[in-house]
């Protein structure tokens, strides 16, 4: 019922952009982007040891993504076209084919006042700590929480600002669908966020997304992100998420089963040209919802993953050497000789240029 009430309100607010006369003729276009590539060596000599996004390779040098973002603003209206090309962009827009997979974000926003903004189109999710653009992360490989989404939303939303606090509410297509296929369930998802950004010392974001997917399952996901800059040289971040999934049995949705994760990011920057980040993540998939391996089929599994990344910066270029160790409660990884094991590790070297 709430989604039905919100839809016309948001539509009216966004369509006003076509008729509103902007008193200021000043406009600005900014163009930003990035290019990245990486080499990865898996100590078990198998790319099958990878269960996270964008780095599914072994002993290969691979391009990641070429990305360019066009952002045009006037005093009240903003248009964003964010395009990406390469395997990273393709995995991000995994429900799209061909050139459509190159659209990372495409939306228009209208701000009738300084306290409210309406947005229509497709945009990156508010859920989680990590982002698809590699220059915006300090680790190059991705967390299990990021990998299991959501990635983006397509719909309508309204953002509100109240001093140091903010709120967002929206409706969207099923998660990660810019274009919902014909002949499937097309229910709208509800989006929500509360944020407090008083200072760099403490920022918190409480996030929600929920609805009925095209496979008839019902999903509710709650997420929290906290960041804190303790000094000029040390900062930290935290991300925790839990998702409940109720599968349709042909008559009704069965009792919900859940997966959850928790990650701590420790950032040290001795100089402007060098930084270190340690990501420690615990991912629980007790009900075998997310880890596709026979060893996890009966009892599920949990994974404790630690990733240490260095960031060497030269002008617009960042070099990222990275070591990662993943430990699982089940034998979902393989050794060099092909025997199963509970532990996997890899070394990665990435280069990211941004402008």
Describe the predicted segments one by one.
Residues 33, 37, 63-72, 105-110, ...:
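Residues on the lipid-exposed face of transmembrane beta-strands in outer-membrane beta-barrel proteins
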Residues 22-37:
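Short N-terminal segments immediately surrounding and downstream of signal-peptide cleavage
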Residues 52-55, 89, 94-95, 99, ...:
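Outer-membrane beta-barrel pore domains
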Residues 22, 38, 43-60, 89-105, ...:
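Surface-exposed coil loops of outer-membrane beta-barrel proteins
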Residues 56-87:
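Glycine- and aromatic-enriched membrane insertion/assembly motifs of diderm outer-membrane
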Residues 1-26:
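Cleavable N-terminal export/targeting peptides
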Residues 26, 73-77, 113-115, 162-165, ...:
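Outer-membrane beta-barrel channels and translocator barrels
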Residues 30-34, 80-82, 119-121, 170, ...:
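Outer-envelope exported proteins of Gram-negative bacteria
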